[in-house]
Amino acid sequence: MTVKVGINGFGRIGRIVFRNAVEHPDVEIVAVNDPFIEPKYAEYMLKYDSTHGVFKGTIQVSGSDLIVNGKTVKFYTERDPSAIPWKDTGAEYIVESTGVFTTTEKASAHLKGGAKRVIISAPSADAPMYVMGVNEKTYDGKAAVISNASCTTNCLAPLAKVVNDKFGIVEGLMTTVHSYTATQKTVDGPSAKDWRGGRGAAQNIIPSSTGAAKAVGKVIPELNGKLTGMAFRVPTSNVSVVDLTCRLEKPASYETIKAALKEASEGELKGILGYTEDEIVSSDLNGNANSSIFDAKAGISLNDNFVKLVSWYDNEWGYSRRVLDLLSYVAKYDASH
């Protein structure tokens, strides 16, 4: 089945979700809304991307609509989500990627325009969070607004799930070495709530907070209260890496842990958890669609109960693909219940 989808917010994630949708067999984008971009500029921004290259396809503007690979995509510029006429386009599933409407109450505004479900492409304080490969099977169709969690949670959770299922995690600390994002500054500037975050993104390694590790406890209840973490924002434009240092319940050699992750990457988590023994660096994974790519050669073990595991993620491309995978999963569930 093909799901008709609308996107609200045509920023980094909105546009990368759109690019991924062109390749996704289950999804058709029929409408986009962004109050800050007019259609001609949206065409330009979708066509040319400094990180992911030129769009592989055709894009034109016809009146106020985009024509992408010959198909019409309605383009709206509404500031109020409840005013977007999703019903007119047939869009039942909405990707909420503004970064502004991240609570159930705010994102529910889309339902007034005819949307059936809203998937927030960010963590949410109150909407149920789902991570593909980890807890999507707990979806029961009751919530009209759900969250795809964060890119870092999507990287960490599959890794933590395999390790916890096989060996048990007593406790763990996560560090994500994260590429800079749109919220940061090109040169030093005001950032009242996060002084360090206001420093020049391309000049500094910037310690930062992240709720990604604690959020794993929401998608894997067994790990609730057992993980926390922090971030370093670094001067790279895309691709990030998670370092999970954890204490294991059952003793296991590093080789045994590697084997378990390799098996999962070829089995139940294929397409979500990748595995590599190559001598890779971050740019090698630009455009990788996995949520998490375990780097077998980068991790270390102090003893059979204390281990550091390293896993990469394209924080734009891989995450955006999961947004669509979750959306597709939810639509299929809804159609059969």
Swiss-Prot record:
It catalyses: D-glyceraldehyde 3-phosphate + phosphate + NAD(+) = (2R)-3-phospho-glyceroyl phosphate + NADH + H(+). It is found in: Cytoplasm. NAD(+) binds at R12, I13, D34, R79, N315. The record marks H178 as: Activates thiol group during catalysis. Its main location: cytoplasm. GO terms for biological process: glucose metabolic process; glycolytic process. The active site is at C151. It comes from the Eukaryota. One of its GO terms (molecular function) is glyceraldehyde-3-phosphate dehydrogenase (NAD+) (phosphorylating) activity. Belongs to the glyceraldehyde-3-phosphate dehydrogenase family. This is Glyceraldehyde-3-phosphate dehydrogenase. It comes from Podospora anserina (Pleurage anserina). The lineage of its organism: Eukaryota, Fungi, Dikarya, Ascomycota, Pezizomycotina. The gene is GPD.
